[in-house]
Amino acid sequence: MEHLLINETPYALEEQDYEMTLLRWLRERHGLTGTKCGCNVGQCGSCNVIVDGKVRRSCVLKCKTLLGKRITTIEGLARGEKLHPVQESFLACGVMQCGFCTPAQVLTVVALLEANPTPTREEIDKAFKGVLCRCGSYVRVLKAIERAAAILRGERWTDENGNDPDRVIGNSYNMPDAVDKITGRLKFCSDYYFENQVYGKLVFAEYPHAKLVDIDVDTCMALPGVQYVQCYKTTPITMVGPLQKDMPIIAYGKVRHVGEVVAIVYADTQEQAEYAASRLKVTYELLQNVLSVEQARISGAP
């Protein structure tokens, strides 16, 4: 039996998993959910890991291509409660927001500083372009990188105003879940796995304004593994909203923008859900588009 070396520990790789992506194998087979699934097409960087010293997108790496390579995930950085200097710097500089992309950010910085202990701001920017942060905490990330680089070189760092992030007086206390975010221990909804769980795939509207004429639920339900198709034909209308409950969970009657959810397909596996969602036939009647404020203000605008 072959093995993959993850965080200096060999993990058995079953033959049926050779074609599995490293991302799914880490998360589904071994519960290493610190590696996050963002776009799943190798673009956003949320799934970054270090392979033989270089940052790689685990969502597009097949397990069979990684035999004999050293792989580091966020779970392999800290030594017990002792954090890696990069993790410590992220804490000291208050980088974390939601924490979803934080593990990928940390690993990207670790690989950068191992290859280049004295990166310039331009080199930092170039290395960090591959990790998209939906919270936008890039300025603090830059400070954390500069601080970590200095510490790894045995130097003390202060910011451009001469402030030391390690000071006690006048400094902010870490958010309660900061360490869990920085180590990848914090779990998001998709990080939980349950016995007999089903997987869902959203189906999005293709048009900015259209009437929903029909959704072919029966044909989709006949596909392998499909358990349920949630749409206006199968589910009572449910309204949600932060102040007023005036927005349907899924489209009813018509769609009002490209990307509005028109259905959710549930199946036994993620692959079955994705395939069935791609085959779900939605029939639209196109309506006049309203693409500007001026158009929307016209009396009787659709």
Tell me the role of every PLM-derived stretch.
Residues M1-N161, V179:
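Signature of N-terminal electron-transfer/Fe-S-associated modules in redox systems
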